[in-house]
């Protein structure tokens, strides 16, 4: 297994950007892969491109517009408003069915062609928003499936799986990229860079995490 190269699933948001710079510390060669699925907050792709260009990281954007056709929801349709809070039952309307399944599957195909075994993704079960494809059991299951499907040894690494948003901010701080993550990323479901709209679930979680990080670690 090649332990010197890694591919990062990169959206241009807080979590994947933190993982990207974490990977840069650990591996000699890092490639970022983003997906264009005609998402409503498409500015995230511009953030991803800008970050990779500014910090000299090889970057590829793969076309996955089919996902938009298959899974209409508040992140892929202009006429569907993002839920401001989690529903009592079921998943939030910001959940894109099959997104992480497809992202990781396509990245695995790409990785094999590049002779790379390590795939890094920023999913987290600790602060997850009710998304089933952010759970550790899903990632481990998919890892086994991809290995069997392609007769190749992949290792999917999830640096944020068991840490909360405050600890994710702390990781960025320890990596020396806190300002980059704070100012140059896009997490907002309404497509607003940095601090975002402040109202969508992603912004609320990000803001709460930063407040807890400041309180706990920047005393």
Swiss-Prot record:
Cofactor stoichiometry and binding remark: Binds 1 zinc ion per subunit.
Alphabetical list of InterPro entries matching this protein: QueC (IPR018317), Rossmann-like_a/b/a_fold (IPR014729)
Alphabetized UniProt keyword annotations: ATP-binding, Ligase, Metal-binding, Nucleotide-binding, Queuosine biosynthesis, Zinc
One GO BP annotation of this record: queuosine biosynthetic process
Alphabetized GO MF terms: ATP binding; ligase activity, forming carbon-nitrogen bonds; zinc ion binding
Sequence similarity: Belongs to the QueC family.
Name listed for the protein in its UniProt record: 7-cyano-7-deazaguanine synthase
The organism's taxonomic lineage, starting at the top: Bacteria, Bacillati, Bacillota, Clostridia, Eubacteriales
């Amino acid at each position: 297994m090649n332990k010197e190269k890694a591919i990062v699933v990169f959206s241009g948001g807080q979590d994947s950007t933190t993982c990207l710079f974490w990977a840069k510390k650990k591996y000699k060669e890092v490639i970022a892969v983003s997906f264009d699925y005609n998402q409503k907050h498409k500015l995230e792709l511009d953030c991803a491109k800008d970050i990779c260009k500014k910090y000299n990281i090889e970057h590829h954007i793969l076309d996955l517009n089919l996902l938009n056709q298959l899974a209409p929801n508040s992140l892929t349709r202009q006429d569907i408003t993002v839920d401001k809070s989690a529903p009592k039952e079921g998943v939030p309307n910001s959940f894109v069915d099959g997104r992480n399944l497809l992202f990781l599957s396509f990245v695995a195909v790409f990785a094999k062609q590049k002779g790379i075994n390590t795939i890094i993704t920023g999913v987290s079960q600790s602060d997850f928003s009710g998304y089933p494809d952010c759970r550790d059991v899903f990632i481990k299951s998919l890892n086994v499936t991809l290995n069997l499907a392609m007769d190749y040894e992949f290792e999917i690494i999830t640096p944020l799986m068991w840490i909360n948003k405050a600890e994710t901010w702390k990781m960025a701080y320890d990596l020396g990229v806190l300002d980059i993550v704070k100012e140059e990323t896009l997490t907002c479901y309404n497509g607003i860079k940095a601090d975002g709209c402040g109202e969508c679930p992603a912004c609320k979680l990000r803001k709460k995490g930063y407040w807890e990080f400041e309180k706990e670690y920047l005393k």
